[in-house]
Amino acid sequence: MLLLADKTVDIKRITAAVIGEMNVIDLNNIEKYRENNRIEAKKATGGLPKSLWETYSSFANTLGGIILLGVEEYRDKSLHPVNLPDPDELIEEFWEIANDIQKVSTNILSYDDVYVQKIEEKHIIVITVPKAKRFDRPVYLDGSIHNSYRRNGEGDYRCTLDQINAMVRDSEIKTQDMNIIESMTASVFNTDSLHSYRIKMSNVKPNNRLQNLSDKDFLQAIGAIGVGEDLLFHPTAAGLLMFGRSEFIKKEYPYYCLEYKDTTQDDKHTIISSDLNSDCENLYDFFIKVFEKISYDIKLTANIKSDITPITTALQEALANCLINADYYGSNGVVVMKDDESITISNPGGFRVELDAARAGGISDPRNTAIMRMFNLIGIGSNDGFGISNIFSVWKSHKLVLPVIEESFNPESITLKLSFVPESKSTKTQILQNRPDIETDRQDAVISYITDNITVTSKEISELLGISHKKSKQILHKLMAKDFVIIKNGKYTLKA
């Protein structure tokens, strides 16, 4: 609980409205709310509106949301209930359509998600739509996957082909890196990368039976090549990405790019790039060079003599996780940025598990399982689902400002920021310091607070969260960059 002057703010309750429990909004004061990227109101006095299903699809494919039937939007954008003549009949019709696979690809709702609410002696229908699990996405309409929708500040929009393909790839049980690329042969591999990998494996696991195999048999054993329909060997996607030469990787992944930038004051913008460095074409070479650079700088700065420390191990895990969970068909590349106070790691592709579950640990659902295994074989990372949880634990034990994880859309990406600033130098209050991923919690709290209060100032956010005025502005500007919030006449409001 965060104590403020005369009132107590329960951050957990505040954020509930924006992380799935949308029914926490105060429906008895519905006029306070406005339509936004998480709330949609429809009058529905003439029956179920056709646009209801576009909103259902968009909420399911984005972050979830709440649909209010029997609620009218006035000219001033305020919401007001109208009396639905027969809400039970509408709900019955709703379930008939929701369970009709010719209309809706999948029903992700439980019966508790749809109910009648009485407001001002008027009956409305509340439909709480969760974010669909990756196996169910995309949620589409009328039997056509091209009728898949997403939600942004402007409302529901039809997904692009790239967005649809990304969701389809993530929905498959077999991960995309297991695919055999029959248009290519083993000539795509960089033999220097492969031999460096084999030497590293022999150092980590000296008695591994794989060390006695020929290169061809070794590649097959680790899943880097496979037999195609022509009964010949071809590289797998994992093998191509891990050991391939960049010109061949880009034939399969046109947007493929790996980049590391160091902008510290004592380093004149060091850049390691798959486009610029011939010795850094693939995932393996990039990982080795970037990790060596990062770990050396950290040991030098902190006067650490050992090569292996909890922090360097956590950084190794973070960098490997980024490469393992990237969607290499995405339009944005892998970017690692280092400055004087932090390292930021970003990869294309959204979350495959809920963020809270990833932070708690124990659930493993990597986007590229074959690549993960290749890293595991040289002692990097684990497949127990505790990678993110372990990183948070290390940062907390070293009393550093806790990591920040953010998910962005259009294009989809995940960003992890690892700060090396001690908690004692942070402006966070002690109670907030102990909360995991507090930056994300704060953004969620701000969205919910604006939902309740329509417009806010940065000063109000500062007082709400107990942070500096400068920090509150930073949070608001991040939400503006994500297209969730806009500023009007010096006040912030949710984008309509």
Which residue stretches match the model-derived regions?
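Acidic, carboxylate-rich catalytic segments that either coordinate divalent cations
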Residues: 462, 471
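Short basic coil micro-motifs at the edges of alpha-helical modules that engage polyanionic partners
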Residues: 307, 435-436
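Short amphipathic alpha-helical interface segments
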Residues: 436-456, 463
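Minor-groove-contacting beta-hairpin "wing" of winged helix-turn-helix DNA-binding domains
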Residues: 415, 490-496
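A short, conserved structural fragment
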Residues: 480-490
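Conserved N-terminal catalytic/coupling substructures associated with nucleotide/phosphate chemistry
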Residues: 1-312, 317-424, 428-430, 456-458, ...
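Long, low-complexity, charge-rich intrinsically disordered regions
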Residues: 430-433, 496
